[in-house]
A protein has these predicted regions:
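N-terminal acidic, glycine/proline-rich low-complexity segments
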Residues: 1-128
Length: 128
């Protein structure tokens, strides 16, 4: 399963979400997550994107396990190894020109609020 930035960047944590996580208590996972969010909030603010953080990997994992937070579609992808601007970038054959079978399920139509609510409920229920 692949979560391209167009899909995963709809999981945008704002200040209210950050405070809600901090309010979950003093469990080490809460502290680590709160610190990570603060780092990314500051990073995105400095980069001109605002006081926010995006949670890419947790969305992809949660959807792979539950199938509840995004639809998927098959896509052939490969990693660009020769490009001077795109070296190391995952690229997809959106037009089917490569003649290769799809090798990933690409996330589409993400339920951002549903995922955030699921993540918060998981953290509340699993940190006891």
């Amino acid at each position: 399963m692949l979560g391209a930035l167009q899909a995963t960047e709809v999981i945008r944590f704002d200040e209210e979400d950050r405070r809600a996580i901090e309010g979950l208590g003093s469990h080490p996972v809460v502290r680590v997550l709160a610190d990570a969010l603060k780092f990314y909030f500051e990073f995105h603010q400095a980069d001109g994107l605002g006081w926010c953080a995006y949670l890419h990997d947790p969305l992809v994992v949660a959807n792979a396990v539950t199938g509840k937070f995004a639809s998927t579609r098959p896509l052939a992808v490969d990693v660009e190894l020769a490009g001077t601007l795109t070296r190391g970038q995952t690229v997809g054959d959106e037009l089917g020109r490569w003649g290769k079978k799809p090798n990933v399920d690409l996330l589409c139509d993400v339920d951002a609020r549903g995922f955030i609510e699921h993540l918060m409920a998981t953290l509340r229920g699993g940190l006891g």
